[in-house]
Amino acid sequence: EPKEEPNDGLYRANYPEGIYYTVDDFLKKIPNETTKVDARELIGFDKELLDSIEDNCFCYYQNSDSKVKKVFAISYKGHLYFQTRAILSNRNKDDNAQTNDFPNSFVRVKNGGENYLYLETRLVNKWAQGFAYGGVGGTSGYYLATDMTHTKGIIWDFKNKEFNIFKNCKDYNRFIEKIHPGSIQKCKNQQPDIEAIRKTIEIIK
């Protein structure tokens, strides 16, 4: 009998449990290995085990207690996670300046359909961050650089086989105007309204 899905309101992508090494493996829905993994928290020296399903985490092999690195995706407890390194390696060519402090971390897919999978993680423009570190320096430079890190909406585009990172509001509008012009944002701030993006994903996914 199929297991009943927990009624927790969280999106679950239909991928067999396991680790996917490459884009092709992921698209075929054939995991390369089904070794058991644990999700652990990003912050903290001990990297505690996570009881709940989190949007961002590290994954560790249960049998060796070593961190899962250099893979494309993991299907874990019914949830699909992309590795941050894979997102940055398979992104749209216009998204090159985006970076993240935890390339081996995993990001959970929050929504999706036949066209797109949607996720969110904290990214920063590495050129702007480098300027903050180098131009100001010291503690002020650190806080300025940290402050430049924003939660970004990201989609996996099945048709183009790439991730598209919504770097800023104008970048998001360039993407959405071709697909759903009614969802273009007014860009009162540099970053787009993430709540509005989530509603749009519900329409275009």
Predicted regions mapped to residue ranges:
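Bacterial Sec-dependent signal peptides at the C-terminal "C-region" and cleavage site
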Residues: 1-3
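Aromatic-patch recognition
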Residues: 5-180
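C-terminal partner/receptor-binding element of secreted or periplasmic proteins
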Residues: 173-205
